[in-house]
A protein has these predicted regions:
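N-terminal Rossmann-like or analogous alpha/beta NTP/dinucleotide-binding catalytic cores
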Residues: 1-166, 251-257
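Active-site cores that bind ATP or allylic diphosphates and position pyrophosphate for catalysis
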Residues: 138-257
Length: 257
């Protein structure tokens, strides 16, 4: 507001000049270059774009945020571009640290509808625990998973030094059952996926897949005590529901490994 009179004075002065004077000043001060027309970014062509299936997978432990809206819409645009399927999957398997809110399931559905997003299918992970247990048992049967009872400090040292865990060679079927029947308490045992103990990234070495929960605050399932961690449940669901492409932040890039 304060600059308006000054700007008007300068404009009037320039307008009072003849064309040659204006050109001379333009040469002295340099012309303002007109920016080149920038084409809008086009969606990159995806590999294996036949029968595209994408998923938006929030934890319903609160209302939808702008951070949620971005991947929700990205996936929706991909689904629309390739005439694929869009899955809304509630990653609600943390009933203790980040327990879901019962009303939040509806909040997400309503807000996605407001954004113009219509999921092809809705999946609730907490209702698929038996499926996750089944896959876990199959992995145990083939030696692909084991129940670890090492304390966190000892386990950290073993993984850091790429040393085989002594729990690997123990009879796993009983140890897995003991996670459910109360023999093991929360923090005393976890089921781990057996991987390459020499993997360059320590986070990928024998990672935890299931843990025992002592304080279950889940609004849909308050009785279960053994719960899958995100990476395990997510991998199973991506496989079962034939997810073809995943849009996620750099912070989750390690999941690709």
């Amino acid at each position: 507001k304060e600059l308006t009179p000054e700007i008007k004075k300068i404009v009037d002065k320039v307008n009072a000049m003849d064309l040659e004077e204006q050109k001379k000043l333009l040469r002295e001060y340099g012309a303002i270059e007109k920016p080149e027309k920038i084409e809008k970014d086009k969606m990159p062509e995806l590999k294996n774009s036949k029968n595209v299936v994408v998923r938006f997978a929030p934890n319903p432990n609160g209302a939808i945020s702008f951070g949620h809206c971005r991947p929700a819409l990205w996936n929706w645009f991909i689904k629309g571009h390739y005439t694929g399927k869009y899955l809304l999957r509630f990653d609600d398997t943390d009933p203790q640290v980040k327990p879901p809110i019962k009303e939040a399931y509806s909040w997400f559905k309503d807000d996605l509808k407001w954004l113009g997003i219509k999921p092809s299918k809705i999946i609730i992970q907490s209702k698929r625990l038996k499926k996750y247990y089944k896959y876990a048992q199959e992995l145990i049967n083939i030696g692909g998973a084991y129940v670890c009872t090492c304390n966190s400090e000892k386990k950290r040292e073993l993984l850091h030094k790429s040393i085989k865990c002594p729990c690997v060679d123990k009879y796993q079927t009983d140890r897995w059952k003991w996670m459910f029947d109360g023999t093991y308490k929360a923090g005393e045992a976890v089921l781990r996926i057996k991987t390459d103990i020499n993997a360059p990234n320590p986070a990928l070495r024998d990672w935890a897949a299931f843990r025992i929960v002592s304080e279950n605050k889940h609004p849909l399932d308050s009785k279960s005590v053994v719960w899958p961690l995100l990476n395990f449940a997510s991998a199973i669901d991506d496989h079962d529901f034939k997810v073809t492409h995943i849009v996620r932040g750099v912070d989750l890039q390690v999941s690709d490994d």
